[in-house]
Design a protein with these regions (language model features):
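Non-catalytic pre-domain segments flanking phosphatase-related domains
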Residues: 1-20, 34-41, 65-71
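Mg2+-dependent phosphoryl-transfer enzymes with acidic/Ser/Thr/Gly-rich catalytic loops
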Residues: 5-15, 31-32, 223, 230-325
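Short loop/turn segments at strand-loop or loop-helix junctions that form parts
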Residues: 16-21, 80-84, 89-92, 154-157, ...
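Active-site phosphate-binding/coordination module
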Residues: 30-151
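Short amphipathic alpha-helical segments and helix-helix/interface helices
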Residues: 36-43, 117, 200, 274-278, ...
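A short acidic (Asp/Glu
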Residues: 60-64, 89, 164, 270-278
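Conserved acidic, metal-coordinating active-site core of Asp-based
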Residues: 135-259, 264-265
């Protein structure tokens, strides 16, 4: 057991449902070698992993699964873009030729896809945003700077994300430079909220089934309406054919102790989307929060515990994984 941690390893665990950003790896950053080693041994021991992320399938591959031995990848499922699609792997380690389901391809015409992106362009112009490619935030600050109007834009197909790296807590001086108001929300002037409110108006007026919502630390996710981490997980856990691709059946994970949720943002007040993973399974399933959050902000009735080892975020999960040895 990890020193100073009161949370012990779950010896009954069969399937872990895990967030990605800041839980397995830092944002837009490959998982560290030690994490890859632990995930590989976790899978080699017969455990299964369901990665649930607002990020794209390409990012999960580039930052995590491509580093894992090919023969172990078939034990992994990936719900990306906040539940818009669920993918798996072939026995040889290649990605399946098509997702197990795709709300995006099933419901969006080419015209709707184009109209969605025109609205994104309109938002960028109205708010005077300067979009840049995605990168580690340290690199972004070094090469681009800290102006709140400089953002990262990530078109993931089934989801478009604006990373408002410098604008989640605007100062009085920064607010004076903007030609539009930014509302005070939970004690902060968060530029994402102003953009989100306008995006809601535009999507509604144009009948585009997209919902803007806060995600991650500084992300504004423009996600398909009605789709969430919860819906994708529930769909998979109810489908024996999908579960069979990772060597499981519904009967294998009936006991709440056979499942576990790993995440880092469960706070309702601060837009924590990892709570949606917990909401997809029995409230008795243990959810481990690897960020220091206020438990009073968690959804009521769920078994959410805060990791109390030496480290937090992805280093906290690494510590937890290492504690089983």
């Amino acid at each position: 057991m990890a020193k100073n941690a009161s949370i012990q390893w779950n010896n009954s665990l069969r399937l872990a449902l895990s967030d990605v950003d800041e839980t397995i790896a830092d944002v837009y950053t490959p998982a560290e070698p030690a994490m890859i080693d632990e995930l590989a041994s976790f899978l080699d021991e017969g455990h299964k992993l369901f990665l649930v992320t607002g990020g794209s399938i390409q990012r999960v591959q580039n930052d995590i699964t491509n580093f894992l031995p090919p023969e172990l990848r078939q034990n992994i499922l990936i719900s990306h873009c906040s539940g818009a699609e669920v993918w798996g792997f072939m026995p040889q380690g290649e990605l399946q030729p098509s997702p197990f389901y795709s709300v995006y391809e099933e419901n969006f015409t080419d015209h709707t896809k184009q109209a969605w992106r025109k609205i994104v362009d309109q938002l960028i112009n109205e708010f005077g945003l300067r979009p840049h490619s995605t990168q580690q935030k340290i690199d972004f600050w070094a090469t681009v700077g800290r102006d709140p109007l400089d953002i990262m834009l990530d078109d993931r197909g089934p989801q478009i994300t604006l990373e408002v790296v410098n604008g989640i807590d605007l100062t009085a001086e920064q607010l004076k430079t903007l030609p539009y108001p930014v509302p005070l929300t939970h004690g902060k002037h968060d530029l994402r909220v102003a953009i989100m409110d306008r995006a809601n108006e535009l999507f509604s007026a144009n009948n585009i089934p997209v919902t803007p919502r806060l995600g991650g630390v500084f992300a504004l996710d423009l996600a398909i309406q009605g789709v969430s981490k919860t819906t994708s997980i529930k769909r998979v856990l109810a489908d024996n054919q999908v579960l069979a691709t990772i060597g499981l059946a519904q009967g294998d994970i009936k006991n709440p102790q056979e499942l576990e949720v790993w995440g880092d943002k469960f706070s309702i007040i601060h837009g924590g989307t990892d709570r949606h993973i917990s909401e997809a399974v029995s409230p008795k399933v243990r959810s481990i929060d690897f960020r220091e959050e206020n438990p009073s902000e968690f959804p009521k009735g769920f078994n959410i515990v805060i990791w109390d080892g030496r480290h937090r975020l992805h280093h906290g999960l690494l510590e937890y994984l290492q504690s089983r040895h």
